[in-house]
Amino acid sequence: MFRVSTCKCDFCKDAAAPIDSTGTLDDLNDIQLQHAQIGGLKETFDTDSDFMKAVDELVRKNILIKVEECRFFKVDDLKHSQPYLIPEAVNLLRDMGLEFQKRLKEKGLKSYRFLITSMLRTDESQHKLGRHNSNATTNSAHCYATTFDISYNKFYDGDSLQYSPKAFAVFTQTLIAMRQQCRFLIKKEYHQSCFHITVVVCRETLLKCQ
């Protein structure tokens, strides 16, 4: 599921779209959408059926990767999205998991896993979600396979779902450190109890894909 290595560029200097280093987890959705449109899928999908017809070829070409449960995270039962992301976003999930596990170990805590609650959406699924979620805008970064949601109040100890204030604190510290490195853009969505995260792609990666 994971690529061998993450791009070694300085994301704050070499990002494909403008980004500043900050420890605040409150990036505007419009900025996340800008990064998604530049770094993600060049064409989004109108319907879930359209996506299913195209997904095998996109995976074969390494444009998309299927995201599956691993030692770093669990994947929720996705009702309004598909478990696929661009390789750079999958790499980011791995790096987040590695950093989270390292910080948990340093504090003598259990090896908690975080929970991914949303990934790639089609226009159809985004429209359906908008009926229930006020945060679901018509044109979403989720449609470009660059963006995922992670629950901030649910963590897994083995296969046991828990709320752990200590795990939440360590995970938040992990996110702050990685946001300061400009690895992603992030917004805490209180209505959905999740972190809305968009991967930052560097210019070098985009040039290689052209």
Where do the language-model regions lie?
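Extracytoplasmic/periplasmic, Sec-exported soluble proteins
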Residues: 77, 81-92, 121, 139-142, ...
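Active-site acidic/histidine clusters and adjacent loop/turn architecture
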Residues: 60-108
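Extended, low-complexity, intrinsically disordered C-terminal regulatory tails
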Residues: 94-101, 108-130
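Structured segments of extracytoplasmic/periplasmic soluble domains
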Residues: 92-107, 135, 153, 174-181
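Active-site-proximal beta-strand/loop segments in catalytic clefts of secreted hydrolases
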Residues: 67-70, 117-121, 153, 189, ...
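Catalytic cores and adjacent binding grooves of peptidoglycan-active enzymes
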Residues: 137-210
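N-terminal secretory targeting signals
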Residues: 1-52
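Alpha-helical scaffolding within the catalytic cores
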Residues: 130-137
